[in-house]
């Protein structure tokens, strides 16, 4: 029990939406790096599991998610990235998820999203928030260095393939993903970039993405990929969907988005997907948590709603 005493203390502080000290974050990130560096690019996950999409610093809504989905470690969780940026509590959100990973490493899987990057966080809020809360960029650096170790994808019972963004013209099989060197900043192009940036589309084949990174991919691509790899489903996040989840490509792909009323103004529901021991899935939708006024922050972050 002794080894987790500190982490239990961190978790109880964080659950009150209070940030840890810089030295506590350093300690936590060292422990997390040790765990994440042993995980695979396609991290195996057992069912039952609850699959979650983007959180984007909406801490109170993450608390609501745990209320609805169950607490760690009672529920086995898989998060598909984008913990930071845009919301007001990126620091507390990402620190809590990393602390839960360290405390319950076999019951929490955290993947990398396109926002878990040095470049993106300098534009969309996490960097500025770290500066505001700590007075220097050290905590931002600790986390962005840790992000390089996050697994890119997960595979539930060899059947459901989970990742932040989508498919890539450079990747036909899961073995290709296993062979990538993931410990680096998210590149501007190539397989690793595509996994974190691509989106499903109504047009067939691969197309250029309006995001300027990754590709769009059609139903033919999803069907072929699932067939080649013996998969029943690709589960991904990365796109705001008004009901919190959205099927496409003849149920070969599902998008899950777990930040309700995204950016405190989009009016969307959030959802999580529960997969039971028989691999049957159920979606739980939820509204934003009631919040007492937001901190006064001048927003310098550009809006991109893609």
From Swiss-Prot:
User: Keyword GTP-binding on this protein?
Assistant: no
Residue numbers bearing the Leucine methyl ester modification: 306
Q: How is it modified after translation?
A: Reversibly methyl esterified on Leu-306 by leucine carboxyl methyltransferase 1 (LCMT) and protein phosphatase methylesterase 1 (PPME1). Carboxyl methylation influences the affinity of the catalytic subunit for the different regulatory subunits, thereby modulating the PP2A holoenzyme's substrate specificity, enzyme activity and cellular localization.
Q: How is the cofactor bound?
A: Binds 2 manganese ions per subunit.
**CDD domains in UniProt:** MPP_PP2A_PP4_PP6
Binding-site residues, Mn(2+) 1: 54, 56, 82
> Which chemical reaction does it catalyze?
O-phospho-L-seryl-[protein] + H2O = L-seryl-[protein] + phosphate; O-phospho-L-threonyl-[protein] + H2O = L-threonyl-[protein] + phosphate
Keywords noted in UniProt: Cytoplasm, Hydrolase, Manganese, Metal-binding, Methylation, Nucleus, Protein phosphatase
Question: Is Membrane there in the keyword field?
Answer: no
Q: Recorded E.C. number(s)?
A: 3.1.3.16
- Any transmembrane segments, and where? none
Q: Which Gene Ontology terms cover its molecular function? A: metal ion binding; myosin phosphatase activity; protein serine/threonine phosphatase activity
Which cofactors are named for this entry?
A: Mn(2+)
Gene Ontology CC annotations of this record: cytosol; nuclear speck; protein phosphatase type 2A complex
- Function of the protein: Plays a role in activating the myosin contractile function. Dephosphorylates threonine at 'Thr-1823', 'Thr-1833' and 'Thr-2029' in the C-terminal tail region of myosin II heavy chain (mhcA). Drives the assembly of dephosphorylated myosin II filaments to allow myosin recruitment into the cytoskeleton.
**Family to which this protein belongs:** Belongs to the PPP phosphatase family. PP-2A subfamily.
Protein name according to UniProt: Serine/threonine-protein phosphatase 2A catalytic subunit A
Which organism's genome codes for this protein?
Answer: Dictyostelium discoideum (Social amoeba)
